[in-house]
UniProtKB/Swiss-Prot annotation:
This is Cytochrome c biogenesis protein CcsA. The lineage of its organism: Eukaryota, Viridiplantae, Streptophyta, Embryophyta, Tracheophyta. GO terms for molecular function: heme binding. The chain crosses the membrane at residues 2-22, 44-64, 68-88, 143-163, 226-246, 260-274, 289-309. It comes from Brachypodium distachyon. The keyword Thylakoid applies. Required during biogenesis of c-type cytochromes (cytochrome c6 and cytochrome f) at the step of heme attachment. Keywords: Chloroplast, Cytochrome c-type biogenesis, Membrane, Plastid, Thylakoid, Transmembrane, Transmembrane helix. The gene is ccsA. GO terms for cellular component: chloroplast thylakoid membrane.
Length: 322
């Protein structure tokens, strides 16, 4: 009872905090005079991280196993993974800011986890025999970390497509340039370096607006780096799952719906990484492939759980009428 109460408190603290954080972040982004509020949003993200971490530890102690046995627990872990991604640029002392993607993703993920749809999964239960393995933590954690990473990379690619094809709205007008500078931290040194690179390289596309060009180049670079990391984690997760499947079911691969869609996900992002090596496909075409991958990930992760079919139906849930 104590652990259940603690988990309830920590979950709602983290959700409330992240809701405040995204409000502060958007106001600081749109209103120049409130730029100092970014420090407050970062403190809020830290508080959210410790709340989610506390929940995972409490759940682990109360259930006796790592909390990855159902959709509710996996969504909380996914929120935790998104925060880890949020901190990567700061650890590297990078000027790039992924919070525009990671913060809304965290609040949406945790908002769904704490909604009434998953109430029946809030209580920890004993693992079914097939899940009582040391591979549970390794396989599922790798898969969820890869999902979080690939989702962020796909959203960055989707942003590239939106920027390149959204011509009816002049987002890059003079009054909005300060937003771009604050969000992506342009500097004079970067300007002259990019300008020099622009004239040296014939492969760089020509944009009527320099800020549009610089922004899409930044997003494309970050998308490639994030998706490369996610693809590596996905590969490790699939290999761990194959070994576990052989121990549990006597076969490395059964073409279960979850396995099939995991393979499709892996193939889509393999195509993306391969397309990056071709100059004719690099840019808009590769971003389109990654954007398709965003939908494939949600089908693989959420859609199969919603259907509750196949060998991976342990964490599924059914929508019950009120």
């Amino acid at each position: 009872m104590l652990f259940a109460t603690l988990e309830h408190i920590l979950t709602h603290i983290s959700f409330s905090t992240i809701s405040i954080v995204i409000t502060i972040h958007l106001r600081a982004l749109l209103v120049r005079e409130l730029g100092g509020l970014r420090d407050s949003s970062e403190k809020g993200m830290i508080a959210t991280f410790f709340s989610i971490t506390g929940f995972l530890v409490s759940r682990w102690l109360s259930s006796g196993h790592f909390p990855l046995s159902n959709l509710y627990e996996s969504l909380i872990f996914l929120s935790w993974a998104l925060y880890i991604l949020h901190t990567i640029p700061k650890v590297q002392n990078s000027k790039n800011d992924l919070s525009t993607i990671t913060t809304p993703s965290t609040i949406l993920t945790q908002g769904f986890a704490t909604s009434g749809l998953l109430t029946e999964m809030h209580q920890s239960t004993i693992l079914v025999p097939a899940l009582q393995s040391q591979w549970l933590m390794m396989h599922v954690s790798m898969m969820l970390l890869s999902y979080a990473t690939l989702l962020c990379g796909s959203l960055l690619s989707a942003a590239i497509l939106i920027i390149r094809f959204r011509n009816n709205f002049n987002f890059f007008s003079k009054k909005n340039k300060n937003v771009l500078k604050k969000t992506f931290l342009f500097s004079k040194m970067e300007y002259f370096y990019a300008k020099r690179s622009y004239f040296k390289s014939a492969s760089v596309p020509s944009f009527p607006n320099y800020y549009k060009y610089q922004l899409t180049e930044r997003l494309d670079s970050w998308s490639y780096r994030v998706i490369s990391l996610g693809f590596t984690l996905l590969t490790i997760g699939i290999l761990c799952g194959a070994v576990w499947a052989n121990e549990a079911w006597g076969s490395y691969w059964n073409w279960d719906p979850k396995e099939t869609w995991a393979f499709i996900t892996w193939t889509i992002f393999a195509i993306y990484l391969h397309s990056r090596t071709n100059q004719n496909w690099k840019g808009t075409n590769s971003a389109l492939v990654a954007s398709i991958g965003f939908l494939i990930i949600w089908i693989c992760y959420f859609g199969i759980n919603l259907l509750g079919i196949g060998l991976h139906s342990y964490g599924s849930f059914t929508l019950t009428p009120n």
